[in-house]
């Protein structure tokens, strides 16, 4: 909210609000998670001012609720995100993404020789953490990649 208490992005009656998305990541989330494959209204705020982050993106999807699996898959791209469930214009639930053990159907294997790049199979990566480092291991070629390598693809 701004200092004059006006919303910069219109409130929704019922649905999901993904807040505290790093700036410039909102569109990527819409695409990767196929959030636009709905006939429901989607409101996007890009480069909004944020006290914590400087700038942030925001996504509001009416009449749609994310599964726990979807929320947790957001952790790769937006680990500080907050996912709010809205009902009758009120926040009725909040959750924070945490890295899942596997990420399915979202990422593309960066190995150009991987079968998943040419065959119609769903992508699947095991998530491995070593301290703060996140490695992703492709189910098909069994190669491990640093998080930033997979996300750049």
UniProtKB/Swiss-Prot annotation:
Entry-linked SUPFAM superfamilies: Aspartate carbamoyltransferase, Regulatory-chain, C-terminal domain (SSF57825), Aspartate carbamoyltransferase, Regulatory-chain, N-terminal domain (SSF54893)
Biological-process GO terms, alphabetical: 'de novo' pyrimidine nucleobase biosynthetic process; pyrimidine nucleotide biosynthetic process
Family, similarity comment: Belongs to the PyrI family.
Stated role: Involved in allosteric regulation of aspartate carbamoyltransferase.
Methyltransferase is among the record's keywords: no
Subunit structure, interactors included: Contains catalytic and regulatory chains.
Names of the cofactor(s): Zn(2+)
InterPro entries, per database record: Asp_carbamoyltransf_reg_N (IPR020545), Asp_carbamoylTrfase_reg (IPR002801), Asp_carbamoyltrfase_reg_C (IPR020542), Asp_carbatrfase_reg_C_sf (IPR036792), Asp_carbatrfase_reg_N_sf (IPR036793)
Any one Pfam family match given in the protein's UniProt record, by short name: PyrI
The protein, known as: Aspartate carbamoyltransferase regulatory chain
Protein species of origin: Cronobacter sakazakii (strain ATCC BAA-894)
GO molecular function: metal ion binding
Encoding gene, per UniProt annotation: pyrI
